[in-house]
Amino acid sequence: MRPTQFVLNAAKKKSGFSVPVELTPLFLAMGVALASGTWFSYKKFFHDDSLRVSRKNPEQSALDKVLNQKAE
């Protein structure tokens, strides 16, 4: 009995990009790490009142106090 074309095509390896099964946990762990890093950074930058990213509120700066203490 000769194999048909359908059976021969099923036995061929699929071409294209395939990810090994062993890398699935790595991709999952990296996705969780990236998502948690993004979430914690967002939380720190947008909800922390003591964090000073720019000079919009100079009253929160302690630089003048430190410079005045050094000058005295």
Curated annotation (Swiss-Prot):
Keywords: Membrane, Transmembrane, Transmembrane helix. The chain crosses the membrane at residues 20-42. It is a single-pass membrane protein. One of its GO terms (cellular component) is membrane. It is found in: Membrane. The keyword Repeat does not apply. The keyword rRNA-binding does not apply. Pfam families: B12D. It comes from the Eukaryota. InterPro entries: B12D (IPR010530). Belongs to the UPF0495 family. This is UPF0495 protein KLLA0D04334g. It comes from Kluyveromyces lactis (strain ATCC 8585 / CBS 2359 / DSM 70799 / NBRC 1267 / NRRL Y-1140 / WM37).
